[in-house]
UniProtKB/Swiss-Prot annotation:
Chain segments annotated as coiled-coil in the UniProt record: none
Domain of life assignment: Eukaryota
Alphabetical list of InterPro entries matching this protein: F-box-assoc_dom_typ1 (IPR006527), F-box-assoc_interact_dom (IPR017451), F-box-like_dom_sf (IPR036047), F-box_dom (IPR001810), SCF_F-box_component (IPR050796)
Domain F-box residue range list: 5-51
Gene3D superfamilies from the UniProt entry: 1.20.1280.50
The protein's name in its UniProt record: Putative F-box protein At3g23420
Record Pfam families: F-box, FBA_1
Length: 268
């Protein structure tokens, strides 16, 4: 008995993980403020996965599930019980709060990936990423047109090689002068910046070049010192062929140094 810790905060890490993983998510946040070590542990990525697995097993036994739901442009954590015939089978546990927001915010879309939530604002060009476990939030500035927020779509993903999340922004613009144009941008969490790839083709030599930004700010754009890819299109097509200004699109794989270009009306 003398070898047992006198204080719960002195528990070994593996034992503390086992204890905290059994605590419901709604109570976990209150426990963080009682112990600095527990607060640090609960923000760990490995613990978040363990907590998810443990809570999923408990919910499966009760046939009870937790989901993220949007109502009236608010984001809530909901509890659904499929065996409860007396009380309400759907209960609202808590609202997702944004402590760094000065005004009431309204969410238009929510995306989930590996424990993080990407929230797209209804009337604000900024994005916010929230970790429901740690309570951390990150506000992300964009260069999107605030008058055309509905023209942009987003996706949240995780890159296992760099161990970092990324956000894909896709915008489809249309006007009567230049027809339709597409815009793709990637936000990298490690560098805390957006990245943009631009395809440039010379009219005289048909040389195609793809350049990638290193940083995008509201009034400044920085480019890599060397182009990502350069190709002599005459060797591929054997004739004079220019990509369309408005109908062509492309994507690149930086690791494999590969680019794929799509052009409307072209067979290759």
């Amino acid at each position: 008995m003398s070898n047992l810790p006198r204080d719960l905060s002195d528990l070994p890490r593996n034992m503390a993980e086992e204890v905290l993983s059994r605590v419901p998510m709604t109570s976990l946040r209150r426990l963080r403020f009682t112990c600095k070590k527990w607060n640090t542990l609960s923000r760990c990525r490995s613990f978040a996965k363990k907590h998810l697995v443990c809570q999923a097993k408990v919910a499966a036994k009760k046939r009870e599930y937790k989901v993220v739901m949007m109502m009236d442009f608010r984001v809530y954590l909901m509890r659904i019980n499929l065996q409860n015939n007396v009380e309400l089978c759907i209960k609202r546990e808590r609202e997702l709060l944004f402590p760094d927001a000065s005004d009431q915010i309204y969410v238009r879309h929510v995306f989930h990936c590996d424990g993080l939530l990407l929230c797209i604002m209804k009337d604000n060009p900024r994005l916010v990423v929230c970790n429901p476990y740690s309570g951390q939030t990150r506000w992300i500035e964009t260069t999107n047109n605030p008058q055309r927020l509905d023209a942009y779509s987003y996706a949240l993903g995780y890159n296992s090689s760099t161990k970092s999340h990324k956000i894909l922004s896709f915008g489809m613009m249309f006007d009567y002068v230049s027809s339709t144009s597409a815009e793709f941008k990637i936000y990298d969490f490690n560098s805390d910046s957006w990245r943009l790839a631009v395809l440039f083709q010379r009219m005289d030599t048909l040389q195609m070049e793809i350049w990638v930004t290193t940083k995008i700010e509201p009034n400044t754009v920085s480019w890599s010192s060397k182009f990502f890819l350069s190709v002599d299109m005459r060797e591929l097509t054997g004739r004079y062929s220019m990509f369309s200004f408005s109908d062509a699109s492309f994507f690149i794989d930086e690791e494999k140094k590969v680019a794929v270009v799509f052009d409307k009306g072209k067979k290759k």
